[in-house]
Amino acid sequence: MGNVESIAERFPKSARAVKAEDIVAEIERQLGDLSIDSIYEKKILSQRTRQYELKAAGKASKVEVLHTLLGIELKIGNRRLLCPDLATARYLSVFAKLGCEIIAVPYDITQISRLADELESGWHRMLVLIDHLATDRSERLKTVVYKRLLSHSRAKLEALGAGTKIPQFNQKTKQRS
């Protein structure tokens, strides 16, 4: 990620306020390849995936990973989704926080844990940059920056798509003669 830079030096002293769009653009620039949409495009969609319908609210909802007697559940708002394991719940939780409707899930379950780590790191990196770049600013500005970053990321993920509903298996089988 490199050094975290303040954008205050880039603007003349006469500038009274930094706009939310400027902070959003700077956060997206500093995140670069470590942003959620970049990880999704380069590391998830590049492999065999299947579609998963989260049916999130389209807005930021409260998301929790719950350990119940029935197993691991992902709670999005008032809905609960049963997940096969903790890694899948963590993976889905990042996209639920963004408010995504349909996403791609890697078919290879051994990849999900690593990707969940990267996605969660990208999520927390984004939150840290919001706090850092909006230091000494109003809570309202921080909220506007947060919501715009979520909507930008959601729009990019929707544009990238969720892949096919069922993964393609392009394997040749032996044919008897």
Each language-model region and where it sits:
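Short aromatic-glycine-(Arg/Gly/Cys) micro-motifs in beta-strand/loop hairpins
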Residues: 50-78
